[in-house]
Design a protein with these regions (language model features):
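Acidic, surface-exposed loops and disordered segments
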Residues: 1-216
Length: 216
């Protein structure tokens, strides 16, 4: 039960059948979330920049460009559906890492179809990792959920899952509150915190089970 992000990859191409499965998952998320997320393979340009080296990325040749029409809730939807895709990639044997700032945005834009009114929010580095990644420290439940003494099991499981979620800036700046089966999650600020909130909410749903609660 650890949070891992993989920044170094081996030079192994993603097979066509895996690419097709991933593309199908992306298409489904685009349809459901009103997004324009795109898979970019065999392209090293976006991670061949000073920022990428500063971010300790090595040999990234594939990524998922997280694009959508500009809207107040775009970042949160990008986080939610981007993480859904990242977990699908993991099930297909791939490794990923959320990348908010340390990649070449200009180079990535050239490879993507970004329409008028759309925005490239961030990317997911993708491929076969040299290792299974680096461990990130996680907060305790009491740090993200105050004033809870006797919490139901589904809520505890949801919080445990949320704390294991990777976040775009590795900050875990969020907190949860509950009133019966109505749950609220909010960002406590910082760069890309709305993206992080979407990621965290998706993980909470996996742990808690959507049949047990509703967002408020």
């Amino acid at each position: 039960k650890k949070r891992h992000s993989v920044r170094s990859y081996i030079s192994r191409k993603i097979p066509e059948d895996i690419r097709q499965e991933l593309s199908a998952a992306i298409d489904a998320c685009n349809k459901e979330g009103g997004l324009h997320i795109q898979l970019v393979t065999d392209d090293a340009d976006a991670f061949n920049t000073f920022l990428a080296h500063y971010g300790k990325f090595h040999n990234v040749q594939n990524y998922i460009a997280l694009v959508g029409p500009k809207a107040a809730d775009l970042d949160e939807r990008i986080g939610y559906y981007g993480e859904k895709i990242a977990l699908q990639a993991q099930m297909l044997g791939l490794n990923t890492c959320w990348v908010a700032l340390t990649f070449g945005k200009g180079a990535a834009r050239k490879k993507c179809d970004i329409r008028s009114g759309e925005k490239l929010v961030c990317v997911l580095a993708l491929g076969y990792g040299e290792t299974q990644g680096e461990f990130h420290k996680i907060k305790r439940i009491s740090e993200v959920c105050k004033n809870e003494t006797e919490m139901p099991q589904w809520y505890k499981k949801g919080l445990e899952c949320a704390l294991l979620a990777p976040t775009a800036m590795n900050q875990q700046k969020f907190e949860f509150t509950r009133n019966g089966s109505a749950v609220s999650a909010r960002s406590t600020g910082g760069f890309y915190s709305k993206v992080d909130l979407g990621i965290v909410k998706y993980h909470f749903e996996i742990g808690a089970g959507t049949e047990n609660f509703q967002w408020k």
